Amino acid sequence: MEKLIIAVDGTSSSGKSVIFKKVARILNYQFVDTGLMYRAFTWYCLFKNIDINNQDQIIKLLDSFDYKISDEQIFVNNINVTNKLISSEILNVINKITIIPQIRNYMVKAQQQMVKNKGYILVGRDITSVVLPNADLKIYLDCDIEIRAKRRFEQNVENKILGKSFKQIYQDLIKRDQVDKTRKIGPLVLVSDAWYIDNSYLTIDQVVDIVVNKVHQLESQK
């Protein structure tokens, strides 16, 4: 059976990474969170002490940027950066980098090149609409916003991240949805041929089972 190229988009905090990492392990596919590519490049800019306000310097750094994934570990120029990508330093400046059209074009091409060999699950913004419009399976994962906020709040409590109340998280998600759906470049959209999954009242494992069964069905038709 031939493996597929799977593209996953959807609302923030709807469980995309958690669910599709599990799906990838079961199917022996390569999971790629495309958002981490932007974080990795941001880390590289900081590592090289580039002036974050100098777009020419940032663009030039693409020439030496080497990004690889191996056994769920992320490497930039052979440095394992997996545990460095959630730092506040990166999050504070990443928006100055992602708005540069040349950076975005580079990332889109790199992501498209990545899946020349099948057996990939790519998760991220505009994956189904812009990056992989011809993917074998396109999925849009959604969830009720109140349930998303509740899950995020409970995760934070479990991980002892106590900075935000449920109400603050809920309001943040409302703003995030609005920004994602209205941004000029690569807005969040539900494309007409995407498989829409609402996981508001499904467990992670239930969604995983549904997706794995669907992939097996499609693989058998190849």
From Swiss-Prot:
Localization: Cytoplasm
Catalytic reaction equation(s): CMP + ATP = CDP + ADP; dCMP + ATP = dCDP + ADP
HAMAP family linked: Cytidyl_kinase_type1
Annotated residues for binding of ATP: 10-18
Source organism superkingdom: Bacteria
Enzyme Commission code(s) on record: 2.7.4.25
Keywords for the protein's UniProt record, in alphabetical order: ATP-binding, Cytoplasm, Kinase, Nucleotide-binding, Transferase
GO molecular function terms noted in the UniProt entry: ATP binding; CMP kinase activity; dCMP kinase activity
Short name of one Pfam family: Cytidylate_kin
UniProt cross-references to SUPFAM superfamilies, sorted A to Z: P-loop containing nucleoside triphosphate hydrolases (SSF52540)
Biological processes per GO annotation: pyrimidine nucleotide metabolic process
GO CC annotation terms, alphabetical: cytoplasm
Family: Belongs to the cytidylate kinase family. Type 1 subfamily.
Gene name tied to this protein: cmk
Protein name: Cytidylate kinase
